[in-house]
């Protein structure tokens, strides 16, 4: 496939597919569904109320390609539920439902680097805006900043990263690591209060669709799309390949950012902020870095050197040398050992993935 052919396909999608940008990017994500605030209990998520947000639903006009999910999962077939949001949601260890409403729980793998937040703020401060805006609204669209309450000393705040008054607080886990005061919230489990049962449900979908399933575990009832390609990504891909600013500025306009001319640096920034936490950043870094991978390694290493919370204690982050590790692996994943065994000696493991690379524990993380 040639570059010209790819551009032609992108232009066909832009002009003829019927896909488009939704009015407000926040309305793509499940946290803006109205079910969370449709109860008589007084439980409210203030952020979408303050910003007048209304979820556009799954399979929206901006979604080009996505995994679909539903309420038919059980403990034999778990994959009908959105497990990615389970991985990226806060721990349940010390969660207070009223304090953290409407967010449900997960396995705690969605913390955001404070260095990334600082870089985003710094970039946003140097932009020009329209419609009276003075900051990039995608920052609070994309993450849930919170005051981190101490699990061992009620009322004590360990770190306060709150950026929007409409976001709820959170009592951090007494045993989880790398809790930073920020969670991404594009893929986060969102629950809702159910008036009928007078209880909190681990997914808003259980309240909106009563009786569809008897399952109640957060692991089995997450129904939001896992989006792989959005129309915004298509516009940015087209800008990059044609070295034109039309796609960039169409994406920026939605977030009340003034137009810019095309440059690779402008393109890189738009992709970073518009598509934050959507699983495209890693491969963007690798392809822009080229064979040396030096720029990717530097960017990864820059995301260290801040305080975080491990086991309920504020501590400096381990300064792991991501650049050195990237150089060892060249960005490749390991070949599964089963496949190497089946191949009977015809396959060699990728560089950087021998036995010495195996993770031992956090205390021996170098």
What does each of the following model-derived ranges do?
Residues 126-253:
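C-terminal substrate/ligand-recognition segments
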Residues 11-19, 237-244, 252-256, 269-273:
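Sec-exported extracytoplasmic/periplasmic mature domains
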Residues 3-6, 58, 132, 225-227, ...:
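Active-site-proximal structural scaffolding
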Residues 1-170:
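An aromatic- and glycine-enriched ligand-binding surface/loop that stacks and positions planar moieties
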Residues 4, 8, 12-15, 118, ...:
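Polar/charged alpha-helical tracts
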Residues 30-99, 194, 201-228, 249-252, ...:
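Long, intrinsically disordered, low-complexity segments
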Residues 4, 8, 137, 246-249, ...:
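Generic alpha-helical secondary structure signal
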Residues 2, 6-10, 239-246, 289:
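Generic hydrophobic/packing signal
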């Amino acid at each position: 496939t040639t570059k010209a052919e790819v551009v032609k396909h992108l232009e066909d999608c832009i002009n003829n597919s019927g896909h488009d940008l939704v009015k407000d990017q926040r309305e793509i994500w499940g946290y803006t569904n109205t079910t969370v605030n449709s109860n008589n209990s007084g439980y409210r998520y203030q952020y979408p109320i303050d910003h007048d947000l209304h979820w556009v639903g799954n399979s929206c006009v901006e979604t080009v390609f996505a995994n679909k999910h539903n309420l038919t999962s059980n403990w034999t077939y778990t994959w009908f539920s959105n497990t990615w949001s389970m991985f990226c949601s806060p721990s349940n260890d010390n969660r207070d439902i009223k304090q953290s409403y409407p967010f449900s729980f997960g396995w705690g793998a969605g913390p955001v680097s404070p260095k990334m937040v600082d870089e985003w703020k710094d970039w946003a401060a140097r932009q020009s805006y329209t419609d009276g805006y003075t900051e990039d609204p995608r920052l609070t669209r994309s993450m849930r900043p919170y005051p981190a309450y101490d699990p061992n000393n009620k009322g004590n705040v360990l770190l306060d990263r709150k950026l929007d008054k409409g976001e709820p607080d959170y009592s951090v886990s007494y045993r989880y690591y790398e809790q930073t005061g920020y969670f991404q919230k594009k893929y986060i489990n969102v629950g809702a209060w159910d008036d009928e049962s007078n209880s909190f449900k681990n997914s808003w979908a259980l309240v909106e669709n009563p009786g569809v399933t008897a399952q109640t575990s957060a692991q089995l009832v997450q129904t939001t799309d896992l989006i792989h390609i959005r129309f915004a990504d298509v516009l940015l891909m087209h800008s990059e390949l044609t070295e034109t600013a039309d796609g960039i500025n169409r994406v920026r306009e939605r977030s009340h950012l003034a137009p810019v001319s095309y440059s690779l640096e402008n393109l890189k920034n738009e992709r970073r902020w518009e598509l934050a936490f959507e699983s495209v950043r890693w491969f963007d870094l690798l392809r822009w870095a080229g064979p040396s991978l030096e720029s990717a390694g530097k960017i990864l290493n820059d995301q260290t050197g801040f305080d975080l919370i491990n086991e309920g204690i504020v501590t400096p982050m381990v300064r792991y040398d991501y650049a050195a590790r990237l150089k060892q692996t060249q960005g490749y994943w390991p070949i599964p050992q089963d496949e190497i065994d089946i191949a009977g000696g015809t396959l060699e493991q990728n560089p950087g993935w021998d036995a010495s690379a195996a993770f031992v524990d956090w205390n021996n993380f170098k």
